């Protein structure tokens, strides 16, 4: 079992319950899922780029990504409906906690020129989204085998009702927010 999951149950729940005066433990916000998305617009010309992106995302997340397809045709981007244009993974349960732990302890500190994550990236409902410019910050990616440096979007979906609660939840895990 992931250390952060135990830490959440033993420590964070009690801290947040006291801070926000919840009457029940079930009111305390928790992390519901983490979604990783990698858009590969260049996949229109070279299918191998999408295969490499899928392999990278599979290595990072530990499960097979879903290839996303264009919802509608856009002439300006030369995209037709149904073209594969990216891949995504939704992590829940044990894999989610393991990824979250690796993200906080290993990956985020390896970001170049890192000064903390922006606190304004909450969506108004307690969910946090962040972008990573290089997939090579994750230790599962072998730098020598990378054909192209790609970015990815990471969305942490919580059961928090407000941004303040969501930020308190992530801050309780020592999430590296900008001061």
Curated annotation (Swiss-Prot):
GO terms classed as biological process: translation
Gene3D superfamilies recorded: 3.30.1440.10
CC terms in the record's Gene Ontology section: ribonucleoprotein complex; ribosome
Protein biosynthesis found in the keyword field: no
Keywords linked to the UniProt accession: Ribonucleoprotein, Ribosomal protein, RNA-binding, rRNA-binding, tRNA-binding
Listed Pfam families: Ribosomal_L5 (PF00281), Ribosomal_L5_C (PF00673)
Family classification: Belongs to the universal ribosomal protein uL5 family.
Quaternary structure note: Part of the 50S ribosomal subunit; part of the 5S rRNA/L5/L18/L25 subcomplex. Contacts the 5S rRNA and the P site tRNA. Forms a bridge to the 30S subunit in the 70S ribosome.
Name recorded for this polypeptide: Large ribosomal subunit protein uL5
Classification lineage: Bacteria, Pseudomonadati, Pseudomonadota, Gammaproteobacteria, Pasteurellales
Gene: rplE
